[in-house]
């Protein structure tokens, strides 16, 4: 099975271990100036007036447009990730979205990217298309680990988008390297030894009436009742 690692971020919404990159459209940021202007006009209208109601509708329509644009983009990305026939396993980091939103410097950007909705859409689409979804530990050093030699570069800063491994000298793109490491971390979490699977009894079409009758007879015997065949025999003997 082909596995895929995904690293979520602010600049690029999703970077995949196969080289694909999905940009973050930043719907709220693009419309933020217009939204602030409409909200300012709304605050200046007299309460209860028809002009205030019209201004409120304009604000609501713009907010709805932003939400629909964001949701449409997330649907397209998650569909592209799960509808690929070659991808059977997706590995992702178990992000603490609520904790990220507590950071006042990142709260608006994280909310605009909508990581929570991305994970929700990806989960149910994976179940639809039969794709395994593996979540790696949120504290795993996916960005700081060299994908070639495994060295953990603890001095990597958040604003460094690329870095060179001090041990082997390999040049890494931060997001792509993280996606590859997330894939490896996820595959290592899979069980290496598989136990014996007990097959489920699934009778053929021709055998189903016989199996259903035998099951019904067993249920009645457990309850202490008389099966259909025994009742018929007793009537014939009479």
Regions found by a protein language model. Give the residues of each.
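Metal-dependent catalytic core segments for phosphate chemistry
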Residues: 12-57
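Short glycine-rich phosphate-binding loop at a beta-alpha junction
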Residues: 81, 88-95, 134
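Positively charged, low-complexity nucleic-acid-binding target-recognition regions
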Residues: 109, 113-238
